[in-house]
Amino acid sequence: MNHRIDERIVVTGLGVVCPAGVGLEAFWLSILRGTSSIREKTFFPNAGSRGRAAGIAQFEPATQFSWSDIPKAEGQDRLFRIAQTAIDEALAHAGLAGAAGAGDRADMGLYISSAIGPMATMEAIVRERLRGDLRDPGIWRTFSFGRIASLLASRCDLGGPYAVLPTGCAGGCDALGYGLSAIRSGAVDRAVVGAFEAPVTPLVEAAFARINATSSRDCPPKGASCPFDTKRPASGCTSLPDRRSVWLWRWCRPAR
């Protein structure tokens, strides 16, 4: 690989699964219209909850997650499904999906951020184990942050190095910077980067409510998010960066 530290890196593909829209086009139209993405949460009972609204992507995974049972197969958590869908869209947007892009994906890196990981699965496992034997030598894999990237890399057919940065709210920026550094250092020619969360779970909501970070505003759900209102009660995308030389050679279009 022939790299220069000052070589310009470009974004050639984007993918989005978020409350404002599933898919890049739907997301962008929602942003332009200024549509509120806050809705009443229905994932679990509101009894005892401080707030009843949340920003939840209108996204139904192929395999539904059951709150009463542990998923039968690893990777059925909503977080994985959201991440895989966003990555697939970014690869398609960059012209690297399917058999045509298999060669480029063979050494493609994956650098992502998730602050809490597959929390829904973690909570389900803990509830199940509390009713029986807590010992399970293989359970650590589900709680391992590295497993998130490992599973996604396998499912999306990405053969390069991967890493998970659990750095919190700014994790998407960290992942982007990590991918940029990896390309400039010569570790990879191209990489998928992004941030993924599926935090609407009983434990996560309770934790945020405990520090008064959830809205208790008495209003319809769409009005619960008001960050610039003086009376406010409280206070995620995937992209595919690429070396410019590779982008020019492949005639890809830069992000607009």
Named regions from a protein language model:
Residues 44-97, 112, 147-159:
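A glycine- and small-residue-enriched flexible loop/hinge segment at structural boundaries
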Residues 2-6, 22, 36, 92-106, ...:
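Acyl-thioester C-C bond-transforming condensing/cleaving domain
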Residues 31, 56, 63, 114, ...:
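Structured, active/binding-site neighborhoods that engage oxygen-rich ligands
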Residues 14, 113-115, 248:
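Structured loops at beta-to-helix junctions and adjacent beta-edge loops in soluble globular domains
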Residues 16, 76, 165:
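Generic anion/oxyanion-binding catalytic loop in active/binding sites
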